[in-house]
UniProtKB/Swiss-Prot annotation:
Its cofactor is Mg(2+). Binds a second Mg(2+) ion via substrate during catalysis. This is Enolase. SMART domains: Enolase_C (SM01192), Enolase_N (SM01193). PROSITE patterns: ENOLASE.
Length: 426
């Protein structure tokens, strides 16, 4: 029987130059594996707690030495000797050890790092790819990437309100071809922006951060780039938005669109989305309304839920009980999956199973503060999520996930790129 021999953590850096945790697990056969925990910029207030030191003399208060110490002392002491391949049991032990609903004691960053490292070590010890260990024989589907090629909101210092403008390469036979087309669109967009004397500096997730005058201009620019790159807009490559509207809302559920110089209520914002969807081939909108605007979400879902994908990120925070509330209220039809919002691999799996049972689409997702760790690429294939959000075709912490998916597609040989089939349900 494989057991846990040692657990330890180290403070390392993420892609924004902020500290994060690298957790390592060593098994009884001396197999060792590590995992680096990501961190978000726009975070839902119901997310599990990311434990920071708040010591202003180190990293402006963002150090994670306390979380590392929790791994190196408390967590280590309680996990040594446990069966390594009993992921659910170990994750439950971590949850009980913390004793709070949101990991306020140990820190979700401490707990998730250990949970990820354990899964990776167990897969390695059994000589299995991580996607096969987590997903079994049914792990066969390569996800459609949602590539963030123009950044706004909290991910960039510009005048665009919406946080992410994405492309989805649906009309291709393989992940490799879909990624190639996306990269070509990205480079074509750069040339177009250069030609308009727009900034081509990039945001946290590798997308460009130009100073457009309003929120529609990025849609025009991306549409142009797709067609100029030689692809059919809407058929081969569609558009998607992450509005991150919890960053735009005030206490009265009015949404401040500075790029448009408008203040809209929920119904007016939904009407605005309907105009955009009618004019552009937008197939997905994430966080179209605030995480607390349940009434607005119900209206959005009624108005657009049969037409496009409506993704809850801040709304659901990868939490099964909150998702259940959304299901009961007929809110949204898809959920963003971010393991660090909930705390462990097993809790993430629970949320995905609930979503799939109720025909909600699942989108595996990175965070804006990332690393070279490619865990979510394997996780997306393991759970056949069908979609993955992991940034643009720039910045090595984003490319690490895409390169891992290329490896997986090559290994699977008979793997399926879901492509056009993604939105053919209901």
């Amino acid at each position: 029987m494989l057991t846990i021999k040692d657990v330890h953590a180290l403070e390392v850096m993420d892609s924004r130059g902020n500290p994060t945790i690298q957790a390592s697990v060593i098994l009884s056969d001396n197999t060792k594996a590590s995992a680096i925990v990501p961190s978000g910029a726009s975070t839902g207030k119901r997310e599990a707690l990311e434990l920071r030191d708040n010591d202003k003399t180190r990293f402006l208060g963002k150090g994670v030495l306390r979380a590392c110490e929790n791994v190196n002392s408390v967590i280590k002491h309680h996990l040594i000797g446990l069966e390594a391949t009993s992921q659910a049991f170990v994750d439950e032990r971590l949850r009980a050890l913390d004793g709070t609903p949101n990991y306020a004691n140990l820190g979700a960053n401490a707990v998730l790092g250990v949970s990820m490292a354990l899964a990776r070590a167990s897969a390695k010890a059994l000589n299995l790819p991580l996607y096969r260990y987590l997903g079994g024989a049914n792990a066969l589907t390569l996800p459609v990437p949602m590539l963030n090629i123009i950044n706004g909101g909290t991910h960039a210092n510009n005048s665009i309100d919406f946080q992410e403008y994405m492309i989805m390469p649906l009309g291709f036979e393989s992940f490799r071809e879909a990624l190639r087309a996306s990269a070509e669109v990205y480079h074509t967009l750069k040339k177009l922006l250069d030609g308009k004397n727009q900034l081509t500096s990039v945001g946290d997730e590798g997308g460009f951060a130009p100073n457009f005058n309003n929120n529609v201009e990025p849609l025009e620019a991306i549409s142009q780039a797709i067609e100029k790159a030689g692809y059919k807009l809407g058929e081969e490559i569609a558009l998607a938005l992450d509005v991150a509207s919890s960053e735009l809302v005030d206490g009265n559920f009015n949404y401040h669109l500075k790029g448009e110089n408008k203040i809209l209520d929920s119904h007016e914002l939904v009407a605005y989305y309907k105009e955009l969807v009618a004019k552009y081939p937008i197939v997905s909108i994430e966080d179209g309304l605030s995480e607390d605007d349940w009434e607005g979400w119900a209206f959005l879902s009624k108005e657009l839920g049969r037409q496009i994908q409506l993704v809850g990120d801040d709304l659901f925070v990868t939490n099964a009980s909150i998702l259940q509330k959304g299901i009961e209220k007929n809110v949204a039809n898809a959920i963003l999956i971010k393991p660090n919002q909930i705390g462990t691999i097993s809790e993430t799996l629970e949320t995905i199973r609930l979503a799939k049972h109720h025909a909600y689409q699942c989108v595996m997702s990175h965070r804006s503060g990332e690393s070279e760790d490619s865990f979510i690429a394997d996780f997306a294939v393991a759970l056949n999520t069908g979609e993955i959000k992991t940034g643009s075709t720039a910045r090595s912490e984003r490319i690490a996930k895409y390169n891992r998916l290329l490896e997986i597609e090559h290994e699977l040989k008979g793997g399926i790129y879901i492509g056009k089939e993604l939105f053919k349900h209901g």
